[in-house]
A protein has these predicted regions:
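Residues that recognize and position ribonucleotide moieties
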Residues: 4, 142, 182-183
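Short amphipathic alpha-helical face segments that pack within enzyme cores
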Residues: 11-14, 86, 184, 188
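Short loop/turn motifs at secondary-structure junctions
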Residues: 23-24, 96, 127, 160
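Small/polar loops that bind or transfer phosphate-bearing groups
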Residues: 30, 76, 181
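Conserved beta-loop-beta/alpha segment of the NTase-like Rossmann-fold superfamily
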Residues: 48-51, 58-151, 187, 194-197
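Catalytic-core segments of class I nucleotidyltransferases/pyrophosphorylases
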Residues: 101, 115, 122-126, 153-201
Length: 201
């Protein structure tokens, strides 16, 4: 899904652009079987460059070259696809002891009239120094398709999360605020993942 083209570039490129806008320039990818195209996309391909050079598509080449100059890319493989928690834990070797952003590239977040979602989240992190998760309101009948948060409102656009429930039935959902694929996590998440037994949620 990450390589699905939207207009002139794949979803993953938009995710990297969003991270750069938020001030993040070390891109750490957790990949798996069949995801080699991700690594290839962020690498030089002299054959492809030679074909595109001088053509009407050279601007695409310039765009990816510029992106590659602005950040570093590192990759590690998830041995088995065991969910998001395991993918984040697999990335520990690349993250070390720093807070970090998570972009699930198959959630395209566009804010045409302002800052990107991750940039807004960085400001919240800088103020509160805690993990931050992005949410969006969904119709009540659709809550069983998402992770849903419970919590207490701090301000108009900010909620202190007390619980996250994966795909609850509409009658059991604490809200209609669904988690979307943007997180800022602190390194203690790795300890929490270690202490959490595997499960479908």
């Amino acid at each position: 899904k990450e390589m699905l083209p939207i207009l002139t570039k794949p979803l993953i490129h938009y995710g990297v652009d969003e991270a750069l806008e938020a001030g993040m320039d070390n891109m750490a990818f957790v990949t798996g079987r069949g995801k080699r195209a991700l690594e290839d996309y962020f690498d030089r391909s002299y054959e492809l460059e030679d074909q595109i050079s001088g053509s009407s598509k050279e601007y695409l080449l310039d765009e990816i070259r510029a992106l590659m100059k602005r950040c570093t890319f590192s990759f590690t493989r998830q041995e088995q696809m065991k969910g998001l928690g395991n993918a984040i834990y697999t990335g520990k070797i690349l993250i070390r002891d720093e807070p970090f952003g998570v972009v699930l590239a198959d959630d395209l977040c566009v804010n045409e009239n302002g800052e990107g979602v991750l940039a807004q989240m960085v400001k919240i992190y800088e103020k509160y120094r805690c993990s931050v998760v992005a949410v969006m309101e969904v119709p009540p009948q659709d809550v069983n398709k998402y992770g849903i948060i419970a919590g207490k409102s701090i301000s108009d656009d900010l909620i202190m999360v007390s619980d996250m429930i994966e795909k609850p039935e509409p009658s059991e959902a604490p809200s209609s605020l669904a988690i979307i694929g943007r997180y800022i996590l602190t390194p203690n998440i790795f300890d929490l993942i270690e202490q959490t037994a595997p499960g479908k949620n």
